[in-house]
Regions:
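Asparagine-centered strand-capping/turn motif at beta-strand->loop junctions
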Residues: 152-158
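Surface-exposed acidic/polar loop and edge beta-strand patches at domain peripheries
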Residues: 1-149, 160-163, 170-320
């Protein structure tokens, strides 16, 4: 029972909540869109999530730009799209969608409870600014288990159908010897490429065709000077990141999730006029690619929620 605890503290100047269940520590920042800033395996002394070494932490203001100013690292939720754009359907057609969505830039309301001394349940919620919805994420930590269940609930509060994209956005440092394990056979589709020229936009994971051969994406070279955004349809609903030490971080999913988004930045890109980053993201997603208009017009993968209805999905993260 003593394994479960919640501690109030400050993380880089922000009020934060430290959630502990024995093997794991998570640090949550409600004022930054419910950001999970720290995901630590206490048994190994290993903190998994990437943190931007260049950008200062501060509260987002109106019209804040994510990649230029707030690509801070950790785990954010991207909704109702990932790329900035214009909402493509009535009655909100023409309404701007901010970069990486609306959720990261607003404070979340947090509720905490402990059930029977065995289960720590932390629910964060936010409502749409430009669109009529309620978004809810619940973290469930059981005592002495190296796993976190994450439940999502989305409510459409309008009398019109709501179209959307969603992606979890946990960022990890890309280290020499870090490996990706994605169950195959899996088909990958290129959504963006920087510093590398794919010879095919759809290919069997993990061999990306390039001029003169293939780029094996299972163990990306952090010094490759390229970046890729891919969307995959794995053979099973999970993916694993393996640390050079042999430790691993695995994410699984259930519900209407259509793709695994994969961002690999091998020192090829920064949107903030800083040196390029070395990071990657494993992103279970509803819909693809990152732009809602493109998803609806071209790719045909997007979320759809009828008037006054709700939907649920879930993730589970396990570390070893």
């Amino acid at each position: 029972m003593r394994a479960l605890r919640v501690q109030e503290l400050r993380e880089l100047g922000f009020p934060a909540l430290r959630l502990v269940n024995g093997p794991l520590t998570l640090t949550l920042i409600p004022d930054l869109g419910g950001k999970i800033a720290v995901w630590e395996d206490r048994r190994r002394g290993l903190s998994w999530l990437w943190r931007n070494p260049y950008l200062p932490w501060r509260l987002p203001q109106a019209e804040a730009r994510y990649v230029q100013e707030f690509d801070l690292g950790g785990w954010d939720e991207c909704f109702p799209a990932i790329a900035p754009g214009i909402y493509p359907a009535d009655p909100w057609v023409g309404t701007p969608i901010p970069d990486h969505g609306e959720l990261w830039s607003q404070p979340w309301k947090i509720q905490i409870r402990i059930e029977e001394g065995k289960r720590l349940i932390v629910t964060g919620a936010a409502e749409g600014r430009s669109f009529p919805y309620r978004f809810e994420r619940t973290l469930i930590l059981e005592a002495d288990r190296p796993a976190v269940r994450i439940r999502y609930r989305l409510q459409n509060t309008a009398e019109h159908t709501f179209y959307f994209l969603w992606a979890a956005h946990p960022l990890f440092p890309l280290l020499p010897g870090m490996r990706l394990l994605i169950p195959g056979p899996a088909t990958a589709r290129v959504a963006a490429a920087i510093g590398v020229a794919p010879q095919a936009m759809v290919f069997p994971w993990p061999q990306l065709p390039i001029e003169g051969g293939f780029l094996d994406l299972r163990e990306p070279d952090p010094e490759g000077k390229w970046a890729l955004k891919l969307f995959l349809r794995p053979a099973a609903s999970w993916a694993r990141l393996i640390h050079p030490t042999g430790a691993w971080w695995e994410i699984g999913w259930r519900g209407p999730i259509t793709h695994l988004g994969l961002w690999i930045n091998a020192g090829g890109w920064s949107g903030a006029n800083t040196p390029p980053y070395q990071n990657l993201a494993l992103e279970p997603a509803i819909g693809a690619p990152d732009d809602l208009g493109v998803a609806m017009r071209e790719w045909g993968f997007f979320g759809l929620l009828p008037p006054l209805q709700e939907m649920e999905w879930s993730l589970q993260v396990t570390v070893g």
